[in-house]
Amino acid sequence: MSEPSKEELLARIAQLELENEQLKQQNGKKSQHEQFNKIDDNFSLDEYKRYGRQMIVPQFGSLESQIKLKNSKVLVVGAGGLGSPALLYLSSAGIGKIGIIDPDTVDTSNLHRQVIHNTEMVGEFKCISAQNYINKLNPHVVVEVYPTALNNDNAFGIVSQYDLVLDCTDHPAVRYLINDVCVLLGKTIVSGSGLKSDGQLTVLNFANSGPCYRCFYPQPPSPDSVTSCSDGGVIGPAIGLVGVAMAVETIKIITGYYTKDNFVPFLASYSAYPQQQLRVFKMRKRQKDCAVCGENPQISQRMIEDGTINYKTFCGRATFDPIDDKFRVSPKDYDSVVQNKKKHILIDVRPREQFQITHLPNAINVQWDPTFRKADAIEQYLPDDSTKDDEIYVVCRFGNDSQLAAKKLIGMGYPNVRDIIGGLDKWSDDVDSKIPKY
């Protein structure tokens, strides 16, 4: 038997550390619960006091509804901008058990919007960070964590343990997976999404009779149209509002406020700019020809678990045609051009907002989208004394749009064009750490 590799040992150490942390959390939970003796079959005095202000709201449903919350088990997929506020309010409201699944770790760039995490938790799994916060917020809630990605292999085993699922992800492939698994298991989904200053939420497969995600979107969006928070940016409170609303819908479902008779499929849309606006649209009912919840379903648990349904293939990948390596230079190579004061032109194709955050000296800002991408000529943006034989270097944030721009310049007849590999992000790593990453 061969000796385990360094990578295998490190993975095993990480797993043992996670198991140790979970045991400590469980032991701490036991000691916390011992402090609260029940005064009846339902709650301790602390719980009556903790939840009293929501139990006296007529629409909530008094003690009966609070008991339903305590007996419920909710899975939250994603502990980011949507999942963070949803987790805070669901745990505060008294959900009995909350599962959190997220493979990512906390990064400093998350903290302006993912409010369940803090600076001390940077580098920690998001689900562990969220668990730590919830344990301090409400010791009556049991928290189960899954520091892994939801996939074809584990989805049914995890989702089957819960009554309801919150989809707080930002990946179309995972969104379709959650939908299909929940429909096949008869679970209701509270689904949210958000980007920049806009967000949406809806309730899917309500009581296993309402429309599902595939009823609304039989086909996924074009991969080229999908923008991440990293690329498009995000206003924290705008997305947080959607996460809070998801918690409200979850409470209404669990407490029985919604019934098959009064529930109407809807899509709620929130926009923060230019004026705050919240609109609710009535959506169509379950579709008879839906691939998973229709009269003749084409998707089964077996097909998902054996990989017949490949969600990444179904959703596709963004098409990207990289430029030939001979037209690319490293940040250090470009730095040599600058240090030697060699005549050249530097074009920065990032959006104006990003250019204003930081840029290299003497850079000319020509946004790739929509300006550069649609342009038939580029001369109007270049210095008056420039010629087509000048050396032109193109930079962006990560080195993707700059390749597209460089290729277009070559097609326009500029022979001496070079793309700066890795963009400003790589420049910060290799040349000047004072250039901020954002």
From Swiss-Prot:
Its main location: cytoplasm. CDD domains: RHOD_ThiF (cd01526), ThiF_MoeB_HesA_family (cd00757). The keyword tRNA processing applies. GO terms for molecular function: adenylyltransferase activity; ATP binding; metal ion binding; nucleotidyltransferase activity; thiosulfate-cyanide sulfurtransferase activity; URM1 activating enzyme activity. Zn(2+) binds at residues 212, 215, 290, 293. Keywords: ATP-binding, Cytoplasm, Metal-binding, Multifunctional enzyme, Nucleotide-binding, Nucleotidyltransferase, Transferase, tRNA processing, Ubl conjugation pathway, Zinc. The keyword Cell division does not apply. SMART domains: RHOD. It is found in: Cytoplasm, Cytosol. Binds 1 zinc ion per subunit. The active site is at residues 229, 396. Pathway: tRNA modification; 5-methoxycarbonylmethyl-2-thiouridine-tRNA biosynthesis. It comes from the Eukaryota. ATP binds at residues 81, 102, 109-113, 126, 170-171. It is an enzyme of class 2 (transferase). Its cofactor is Zn(2+). GO terms for biological process: protein urmylation; tRNA wobble position uridine thiolation. Residues 340-436 form the Rhodanese domain. Its EC number is 2.7.7.-, 2.8.1.-. GO terms for cellular component: cytoplasm; cytosol. In the N-terminal section; belongs to the HesA/MoeB/ThiF family. UBA4 subfamily. Plays a central role in 2-thiolation of mcm(5)S(2)U at tRNA wobble positions of cytosolic tRNA(Lys), tRNA(Glu) and tRNA(Gln). Acts by mediating the C-terminal thiocarboxylation of sulfur carrier URM1. Its N-terminus first activates URM1 as acyl-adenylate (-COAMP), then the persulfide sulfur on the catalytic cysteine is transferred to URM1 to form thiocarboxylation (-COSH) of its C-terminus. The reaction probably involves hydrogen sulfide that is generated from the persulfide intermediate and that acts as a nucleophile towards URM1. Subsequently, a transient disulfide bond is formed. This is Adenylyltransferase and sulfurtransferase UBA4. It comes from Candida albicans (strain SC5314 / ATCC MYA-2876) (Yeast). The gene is UBA4.
